[in-house]
């Protein structure tokens, strides 16, 4: 028996045929399916094709296949490889996961960024994310004093 297929259309005009059961991991898409708005495909105005490919890859991996369950350990290893991406791609995935309302992908991408920050000094964080320090030394000192609890 073949699964029902739906078409997802990226913001740059690419079309992707995906199993409905895989695509509805996105609450945004699930609501469109419920409202029967999928006949002509689902336009995803905020998601480029290179990011949609990654989202589909993630959803396919996380689609629950009762016949072939995946262990949590294997999923964690897969997640680690999946998130081995350029920063800009991770940020675009965060935006896509938020727009598509895929909580598990949103959590994974945000945790990846949190792990990039964990244990770093403000200077290291600025360097990692190319953030310009536009505080004067006096302003920076005032912020540090205000938030001393965070540095303990």
Curated annotation (Swiss-Prot):
Superkingdom of origin: Eukaryota
UniProt keyword Transmembrane helix, yes or no: no
Keywords in alphabetical order: Nucleus, Ubl conjugation pathway
GO BP annotations listed: auxin-activated signaling pathway; jasmonic acid mediated signaling pathway; protein ubiquitination; response to auxin; response to jasmonic acid; ubiquitin-dependent protein catabolic process
Subcellular location as annotated: Nucleus
Tissue expression as described in the entry: Expressed in young seedlings, roots, leaves, floral stems, inflorescences, and siliques, with a slightly higher level in inflorescence than in other tissues.
Gene3D superfamilies registered for this protein in UniProt: Potassium Channel Kv1.1, Chain A (3.30.710.10)
One Gene Ontology cellular component annotation held by this UniProt entry: nucleus
Region (Interaction with the F-box domain of F-box proteins): 94-152
UniProt keyword annotation of Nucleus present: yes
InterPro entries assigned: SKP1 (IPR016897), SKP1-like (IPR001232), SKP1-like_dim_sf (IPR036296), SKP1/BTB/POZ_sf (IPR011333), Skp1_comp_dimer (IPR016072), Skp1_comp_POZ (IPR016073)
Record pathway: Protein modification; protein ubiquitination
Any single Pfam family the record assigns to this protein: Skp1_POZ
Subunit structure: Part of a SCF (SKP1-cullin-F-box) protein ligase complex. Interacts with ADO3/FKF1, COI1/FBL2, EBF1/FBL6, PP2B10, At3g61590 and At5g49610.
Described function: Involved in ubiquitination and subsequent proteasomal degradation of target proteins. Together with CUL1, RBX1 and a F-box protein, it forms a SCF E3 ubiquitin ligase complex. The functional specificity of this complex depends on the type of F-box protein. In the SCF complex, it serves as an adapter that links the F-box protein to CUL1. Plays a role during early flowers reproductive development.
Entry's family note: Belongs to the SKP1 family.
Name assigned to this protein: SKP1-like protein 12
Species annotation: Arabidopsis thaliana (Mouse-ear cress)
Gene: ASK12
